[in-house]
Amino acid sequence: MACSDPEPAKEPVLSGVPTDSVCPAGSKLTYDSWGSTFFATYCTRCHSKTREGEQRNGAPDGYNWDDLNSVRAHQEQIDLMAAASIDVVNHEMPPSDPRPPTSERQKLGEWLACGAP
């Protein structure tokens, strides 16, 4: 999931803390209503199925956040690297601007806790 490493990593090194975010009753966050825009804004400049080789800036192959199935397969890693809750803010990703504010990272944690609908 590294975006600045010159060589693609085999597996990302996870350095964050689980957010233990919860899915609140009535959460309306979905990939279509929120997630796709979040990932397009902050992540897919590296984590995109349309990027290859050096265009991925070190993001491992298969870690494509413009593909909901890939996001769901890597929910734990995304939580550890980029999500937030009331008590925890992981900000390993993205490594450069634009970076999401804490409020958006908290929405990411909520959305992941809800199963990434």
Describe the predicted segments one by one.
Residues 3-117:
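Aromatic- and Gly/Pro-enriched helix-to-coil junctions and flexible linker segments
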